[in-house]
């Protein structure tokens, strides 16, 4: 019997234990008594397990945040940029004294 046909049939002969009869959706469904007694300023004292994890991603993008640009790198950290500023010329001097072959990018 194909898998799809088995999934579509009702599972009447299957035995459920007390653990498997618990539904995660029942936790997410608000109780009517809770809604009547709560004020708009009060927040619920508990958050159901997994409530915030449904369909939520922590970050927008993953792994594509660094997009290197040679032009920007040389403009920011290049020799001419170092030579123009007072602090940059100190960096060039320090690297030259240390014996670096490459003073900047």
UniProtKB/Swiss-Prot annotation:
One GO MF annotation is: structural constituent of ribosome
Residues of the transit peptide: 1-16
Biological process annotations from GO: mitochondrial translation
One cellular component term (GO) for this entry is:
cytoplasm
Q: Which Pfam families match?
A: Ribosomal_L34
- Cellular location of this protein? Mitochondrion
Keywords in alphabetical order: Mitochondrion, Ribonucleoprotein, Ribosomal protein, Transit peptide
Q: Which domain of life is it from?
A: Eukaryota
Q: Which InterPro entries match?
A: Ribosomal_bL34
Say which family it is in: Belongs to the bacterial ribosomal protein bL34 family.
Q: How does it assemble?
A: Component of the mitochondrial large ribosomal subunit (mt-LSU). Mature yeast 74S mitochondrial ribosomes consist of a small (37S) and a large (54S) subunit. The 37S small subunit contains a 15S ribosomal RNA (15S mt-rRNA) and 34 different proteins. The 54S large subunit contains a 21S rRNA (21S mt-rRNA) and 46 different proteins.
Q: What else is known?
A: Present with 200 molecules/cell in log phase SD medium.
Q: What is this protein called?
A: Large ribosomal subunit protein bL34m
Q: Which organism is it from?
A: Saccharomyces cerevisiae (strain ATCC 204508 / S288c)
